[in-house]
Amino acid sequence: MDETMLVNEYAQKVISERQYKYQTRQSYVKGIKAIGIWDMEVASLSPQLFYEKLDSIPNLNTRRSITIVCKSVFKDLGICKDLKIIDGIPRTYDLPTQNVLHKLIDRSKKYSKYLYLCMYAGLRVGEACAITPKSVIKEGNSYWLSIDKAWSQDGQNLGSPKTIGKVMIPKWLADQVLEISDDEIWKKGMPTQLISWACCNLSKKGEKIHINPHMLRHWFATDMIRRQVPVHIVMRQMRHKNINTTMKIYAQVHNSDFVDALPTRPEDKAVSMGNVVNLFN
């Protein structure tokens, strides 16, 4: 290897030679740039430099993801082999009520179908953008979505999703998908962030409640868990690779859940349970 080779040259060469998905390649480049080594010479890299760069990242989830990037891209150099991959911190949300979420989503005439796909099918935003009427499968009286494609964040690549699978959806949502016209189908060059930006605009109006596609996917999982849907069904609906992911990342606990868990004395009022929502009505 040329002693004067720059990190950007080395990284792009490594990334192009490996079988990474398009979005993974984009994320890896972004991660390396984020720690300020992109224009440095490879010869100047050291384990201590990586440790200091990563240790300065305040967000633990970001630090974890960039550590994974560095260990992967610079694996052959051996300078990142001792970096520890820290545990991530699950995202938590103060979830609005179902009615409030519907009220917000319905304000978006252009993107409401995509947001409902996140909320009632647990899709990631790139997966929701890739859905077309051909994605709907009817088996008996049940409707399913085939999840086998996803748009990249920049809208330049339609590739395979993080996890391929089938998700059962309510009939009303299947009807909405079947009504998607050719003009409404997501086009190349449209960044999926358009939906996230639309969510920001929705949040600026009315109740000042902030929503985003990941929150809606989170609601989908949390709602099933709170309705005591068997965990293996939640795992399949979320298309997780194992049950640990389902329980660790998406089982959100609030103070109210602790209150419900407290034993009561005979003179105490029973703690009222939340309304049970039937997802498939």
Residue ranges and their predicted role:
Residues 2-31, 54-61:
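Short, aromatic/basic-rich helix-turn unit that serves as a nucleic-acid recognition element
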Residues 20, 95, 238-263:
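Catalytic-site neighborhood detector that most strongly recognizes the C-terminal catalytic loop/helix
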Residues 136-140, 229-249:
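Short, polar N-cap/turn motifs at the start of nucleic acid-interacting alpha helices
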Residues 160-166, 171, 264-281:
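C-terminal secondary-structure termini that scaffold catalytic or DNA-interacting sites
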Residues 170-208, 220:
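Active-site/catalytic core of tyrosine-dependent DNA strand-transfer enzymes
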